[in-house]
């Protein structure tokens, strides 16, 4: 494995080489296998989203399929948790939140060229379990040569998709961001939130 690198700037944490490429390949395969059986969700239909706002397909980890996720993605999530613990410790969030953070549902998203979540937004709202979102994280599952960045409005920052790259940031203002459309190929990410009890 290459040397792990960490860059935390303005509480936006970028972690490289924590997750192996083969772990990312397993996540993509998990998504594609579920898509064959129509187990993925189109956001235009499921969220009544405008095609100009959100356009991608998602596969959620829920109570009915959690075993499949854990069997396939356990090494990835254990490596992610190492990055998360580093982030929480080095930003002061671990003390501030006094261990009241917990995971919520995971999802894998596939975005085709020119699609994506184009609208500037923040994640600070109640999630599906009616608990407040504290942090957002994304794991890029493949390289994108052109486009597909996570862009932060108030920090003039774009994070390029790179296989295995982890990005963690606070869910609230001023972390206004968007997912720029991938231009050179399909984009896969695993994404979710850390919730506050």
Describe each region flagged by the PLM:
Residues 1-166, 174-197:
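Fe(II)/2-oxoglutarate oxygenase catalytic core
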């Amino acid at each position: 494995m290459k040397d792990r690198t960490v860059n935390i700037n303005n509480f936006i944490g970028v972690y490289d080489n924590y997750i192996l490429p083969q772990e990312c390949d397993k996540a993509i395969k998990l998504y594609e296998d579920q898509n064959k059986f129509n187990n993925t969700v189109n956001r235009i239909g499921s969220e009544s989203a405008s095609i100009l706002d959100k356009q991608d397909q998602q596969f959620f980890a829920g109570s009915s399929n959690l075993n499949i996720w854990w069997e396939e993605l356990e090494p990835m999530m254990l490596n992610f948790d190492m990055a998360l613990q580093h982030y929480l410790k080095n930003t002061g969030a671990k003390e501030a939140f006094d261990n009241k953070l917990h995971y919520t549902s995971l999802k894998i998203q596939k975005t085709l060229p020119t699609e994506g979540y184009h609208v500037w937004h923040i994640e600070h709202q109640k999630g599906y379990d009616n608990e407040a979102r504290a942090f957002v994280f994304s794991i890029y599952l493949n390289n994108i040569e052109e486009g597909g960045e996570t862009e932060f409005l108030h920090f003039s920052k774009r994070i390029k998709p790179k296989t295995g790259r982890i990005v963690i940031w606070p869910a609230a203002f001023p972390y206004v961001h968007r997912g720029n459309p991938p231009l050179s190929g399909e984009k896969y990410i695993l994404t979710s939130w850390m919730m506050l009890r």
